[in-house]
């Protein structure tokens, strides 16, 4: 599966900053010190109802991670999956009377268009769950043969008790885990499971549903969590720098993934930092496909909204915060974009070297994009109030905002 085209990232003068970021597993902001190649895995979409503003906010956060790393002259190895077979996708295709493969392809193509418009840097590896199945099957067999998984009526479940570190990613108690498991695709009440929290690794073929050859597992399809583990281990290996996604992925998805990886490799954790973006609400409720209260990037683009303004609306909120999309949020972003563009359109302006360092410092401090925006606001206000004589300043600001914030002025 191919990703989307990359926009050029301008090189900036001076030195980039090492990133400090909030790690869900430890509950604190930790320093990250990647090697020459920083490694990041971000969980991708289930391709229906793409791309809503919650999606966009999540991928914006991890785009900033990449930009901070690139500014330190590191290379970035970024992997993202597409959950292109899953119960919600199949249910949506059946509801709409369309082929599930066609639906997935259409929505994935739309997602790529939205990511391109928003100038999100693409992954080097963009992997669909379906194409990963040949690599998933032997992992499930290994877990079963090692006693870390068991069969139940043809399905294969992972035993959470096989991982002594289970629970150390989300830090939730058993009651909270059970509740979230039921809400987020698990089946804690299924009779016969060794532990209600045990997640499915391999679903035996069901009538009327797609299935694939599972060798000794029989025909079926993989569970959600093992898909990401297989893709991440194949392309990044253990101990990569960041695993990212929305805060609703901390449990069960990232917790279970870490357990699968530990049982397969004997190593923990799978990622050095588990980083989670906040939820975006509309009319007081979390924006979600199940509720249908969605604001789509593609709809805004069709309505003529500049994608740079959409990106500024996302950047105005700290990535870990929960926030609400409103008309006022977009109006503020449009006004900011106009102010910034007018400021950099002049032939000269106030010196900008200190501004570049302010943006770097803000982003290195747990991706504090609102502080970075405030710094640019101050420079733009000074430009409009008094101007300046530095002929290179507007260009420096444009390149810094492009390279570090992904906004083209």
Swiss-Prot record:
A GO biological process of this protein is:
mycothiol biosynthetic process
Q: Which Gene3D superfamilies match?
A: Anticodon-binding domain of a subclass of class I aminoacyl-tRNA synthetases (1.20.120.640), HUPs (3.40.50.620)
Kindly list the cofactors needed.
Zn(2+)
Span(s) of short sequence motif 'KMSKS' region: 286-290
**Which amino acid positions bind Zn(2+), per UniProt?**
43, 228, 253
Q: Which UniProt keywords apply?
A: ATP-binding, Ligase, Metal-binding, Nucleotide-binding, Zinc
Question: Which residues of this UniProt protein bind L-cysteinyl-5'-AMP?
Answer: 43-46, 58, 81-83, 224, 246-248, 280
Enzyme nomenclature, EC number? 6.3.1.13
Instruction: Please name the CDD domains in this protein's record.
Output: CysRS_core
Database matches in SUPFAM superfamilies: Nucleotidylyl transferase (SSF52374)
Q: Which reaction does it catalyse?
A: 1D-myo-inositol 2-amino-2-deoxy-alpha-D-glucopyranoside + L-cysteine + ATP = 1D-myo-inositol 2-(L-cysteinylamino)-2-deoxy-alpha-D-glucopyranoside + AMP + diphosphate + H(+)
Query: Which parts of the sequence form the motif 'HIGH' region?
Result: 45-55
Q: Which is one Gene Ontology cellular component term of this protein?
A: cytosol
- What InterPro entries does the entry give? Cys-tRNA/MSH_ligase (IPR024909), Mycothiol_ligase_MshC (IPR017812), Rossmann-like_a/b/a_fold (IPR014729), tRNA-synt_1_cat_dom (IPR032678)
The secretion signal range is: none
Job description of the protein: Catalyzes the ATP-dependent condensation of GlcN-Ins and L-cysteine to form L-Cys-GlcN-Ins.
The record describes its quaternary structure and partners as:
Monomer.
NCBIfam families in the record: mycothiol_MshC
The family assignment reads:
Belongs to the class-I aminoacyl-tRNA synthetase family. MshC subfamily.
Q: What is this protein called?
A: L-cysteine:1D-myo-inositol 2-amino-2-deoxy-alpha-D-glucopyranoside ligase
Q: Which gene encodes it?
A: mshC
């Amino acid at each position: 599966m191919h990703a989307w085209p990359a926009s050029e990232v301008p090189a900036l003068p001076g030195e980039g900053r090492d990133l400090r970021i909030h790690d869900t597993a430890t509950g604190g902001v930790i320093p990250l010190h990647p090697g020459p190649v920083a490694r990041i895995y971000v969980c991708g979409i289930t391709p229906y109802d793409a791309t809503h503003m919650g999606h966009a906010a999540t991928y914006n956060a991890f785009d900033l991670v990449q930009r901070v790393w690139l500014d330190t002259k590191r290379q970035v190895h970024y992997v993202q999956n597409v959950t292109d077979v899953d119960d919600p996708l199949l249910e949506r295709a059946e509801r709409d009377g369309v082929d599930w493969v066609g639906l997935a392809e259409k929505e994935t193509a739309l997602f790529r268009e939205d990511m391109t418009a928003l100038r999100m840097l693409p992954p080097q590896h963009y992997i669909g769950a379906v194409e990963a199945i040949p690599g998933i099957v032997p992992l499930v067999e290994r877990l079963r043969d090692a006693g870390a998984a068991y069969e139940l009526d043809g399905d294969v479940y992972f035993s959470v008790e096989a991982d002594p570190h289970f629970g150390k990613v989300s830090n939730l108690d058993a009651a909270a885990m059970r509740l979230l498991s039921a809400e987020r695709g698990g089946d804690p009440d299924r009779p016969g499971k060794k532990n209600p929290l045990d997640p499915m690794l391999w679903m035996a073929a069901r009538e009327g549903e797609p299935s694939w050859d599972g060798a000794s597992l029989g025909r079926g399809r993989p569970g959600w969590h093992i898909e990401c583990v297989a893709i991440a281990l194949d392309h990044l290996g253990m101990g990569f720098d960041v695993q990212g996604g929305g805060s609703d992925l901390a449990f069960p998805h990232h917790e279970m993934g870490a357990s699968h990886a530990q049982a397969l490799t004997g190593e923990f954790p799978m990622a050095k930092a588990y980083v989670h973006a906040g939820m975006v609400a509309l009319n007081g409720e979390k924006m979600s496909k199940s509720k249908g209260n969605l604001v789509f990037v593609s709809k805004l683009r069709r309505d003529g909204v500049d994608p740079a303004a959409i990106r500024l609306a996302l950047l105005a909120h700290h990535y870990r915060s929960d926030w609400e999309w409103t008309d006022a949020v977009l109006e503020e972003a449009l006004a900011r974009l106009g102010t910034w563009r007018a400021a950099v359109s002049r032939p000269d302006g106030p010196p900008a070297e200190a501004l570049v360092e302010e943006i770097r410092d803000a982003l290195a401090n747990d991706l504090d994009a609102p502080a970075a925006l405030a710094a640019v606001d101050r420079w733009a206000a000074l430009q409009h109030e008094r101007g300046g004589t530095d002929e290179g300043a507007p260009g420096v600001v444009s390149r810094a905002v492009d390279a570090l914030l992904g906004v083209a002025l």
